[in-house]
């Protein structure tokens, strides 16, 4: 709708000519936006006549992203979206057992976004848990000390445990010198969101280029126990020369995260009903050189990002 110079409101079709909008009666009138001194004004909607709890119930069947969009439609929608009944549906059913009782929130919406933005340590520090903000899917990172298995990690001449402020866990392992490099980690899929495709990542930092390991393709596998695993090769740094770069184009390269750590995708799996165990492994035993300079924060499981958006 556009305000005319004569003070009357008129609609404009694709050719710029004024015409009456079909179905513009008060019973079927849709939300419209009109210009009024630069302010955006939402017109009345049939939905505004519904009880607020009814609107909340409808919105709870969408997604957190859709709910936030709906809140901008009108004051009625905003109030409905902010209700605890909506965000209780977006939170996982077991959230009360994952969030410490010492953390108090004024609403379920505040709780939801707090879990998204501030991962929670669970299982006595064995895992880090958070939610994916756009859809509420559960994400986990395994602690190297409590939920992973690393060859020779208890031998001080090969690995050492260090504390760094940017890590989620109290201690993380730093590789000093090994020939046989092997890291494994897994978890019960009932802790993850069902009906969801997940990707597994190794989250790490390197020192001095990670000698004899950073530029070597490392074997990675991910899969549900008892089923065929996916296999690929990853780099912790990347090839050191152009010839090797040409030979290993299909090797997964690491990427830098917003938190400053690096990550490399190990593989994917589909969590159908949550009745399985997912295992991951990272192995490099082919090159007979002493490897060093790798700091592991953990193995992370989070929903796979779709390449296509509708």
From Swiss-Prot:
Pfam families: F-box (PF00646), PP2 (PF14299). Residues 44-90 form the F-box domain. Residues 1-34 are annotated as: Disordered. It comes from the Eukaryota. One of its GO terms (molecular function) is carbohydrate binding. SMART domains: FBOX. This is Putative F-box protein PP2-B2. The gene is PP2B2.
């Amino acid at each position: 709708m556009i305000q005319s110079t004569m003070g009357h409101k008129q609609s404009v079709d694709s050719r710029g000519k004024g015409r009456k909008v079909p179905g513009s009666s008060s019973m079927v009138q849709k939300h419209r936006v009109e210009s009024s001194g630069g302010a955006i004004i939402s017109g009345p909607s049939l939905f505004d006549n519904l009880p607020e709890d009814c609107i909340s119930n409808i919105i709870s069947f969408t997604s957190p992203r859709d709910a936030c969009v709906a809140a901008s439609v009108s004051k009625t929608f905003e109030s409905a979206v902010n209700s605890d009944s909506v965000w209780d549906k977006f939170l996982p059913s077991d959230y009360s057992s994952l969030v410490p009782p010492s953390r108090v929130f004024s609403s379920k919406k505040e709780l939801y976004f707090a879990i998204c933005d501030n991962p929670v340590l669970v299982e006595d520090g064995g895992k880090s848990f958070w939610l994916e903000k756009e859809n509420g899917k559960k994400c986990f990172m395994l602690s190297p000390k409590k939920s992973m298995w690393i060859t020779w990690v208890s031998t001080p001449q090969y690995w050492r445990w260090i504390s760094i402020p940017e890590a989620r866990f109290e201690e993380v392992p730093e590789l000093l010198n090994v020939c046989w490099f092997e890291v494994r980690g897994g978890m019960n899929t009932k802790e993850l969101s069902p009906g969801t495709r997940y990707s597994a990542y190794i989250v790490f930092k390197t020192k001095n280029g990670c000698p004899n390991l950073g530029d070597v393709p490392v074997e990675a596998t991910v899969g549900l126990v008892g089923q065929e695993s996916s296999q690929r090769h990853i780099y912790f740094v990347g090839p050191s020369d152009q010839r090797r770069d040409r030979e290993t184009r299909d090797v997964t390269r690491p990427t830098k995260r917003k938190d400053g750590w690096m990550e490399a995708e190990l593989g994917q799996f589909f969590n159908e009903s949550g009745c399985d165990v997912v295992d991951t492994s990272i192995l490099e035993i082919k090159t007979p050189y002493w490897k060093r300079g790798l700091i592991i924060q953990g193995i992370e499981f989070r929903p796979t990002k779709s390449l296509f958006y509708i």
